[in-house]
Amino acid sequence: MSPLAAFEAVADIRPQRAIHTLRDVAPLPNSLAFAASPVKTANAQFLADALDVLLRQSPPDEDLSDFLFDAVAHFAAAEGAATANFNASFFYHLTYFLGISPNLEGEGSVFDLRSGSLAPAPPLHPDYVAGDDCDALRALARVPLRHCGMLRIPRADRARALDTILRYYSIHIAPLDSLASLAIVRSLFT
């Protein structure tokens, strides 16, 4: 099975065991889409690596689980622009569930990555974006993940938007720039 593949299984969970046993494992239908596409498989590996870092210390959260399950199903069915825009849109919308959602409403032409909000002028630190990069983040904020294929973001702007969001996570949760799978995804989508 590929990373992020959803499956059904019977689990034998015993409190005394550190490792639990699974049997009768069967992939769910949308999981087969990853196996058919090398691009989606590479992207699923990156998402799994990033989620491992970001969610390592997270307590169980049903809303987050629902979001992740729905997002993976959407990505499995995505084609064209929806596939290309998925990473940036997914990581932007994931911020809501991790309690670090940026505030992109109101006036301001600069997004301060440390405060997570718009500002009228650049801050005194280097962690901010402005211009087209700020506009790309606003576009991601306006469009729900399931409609990310409707976004018309040029390839270079999309790559910078993803880099900005990953920097945002690095500031607020954990660094993601050292993931080996990130280089592969960058070569595919940038």
Show where each model-derived region lies:
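Non-catalytic alpha-helical scaffolds and adjoining flexible linkers that form interface surfaces
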Residues: M1-T190
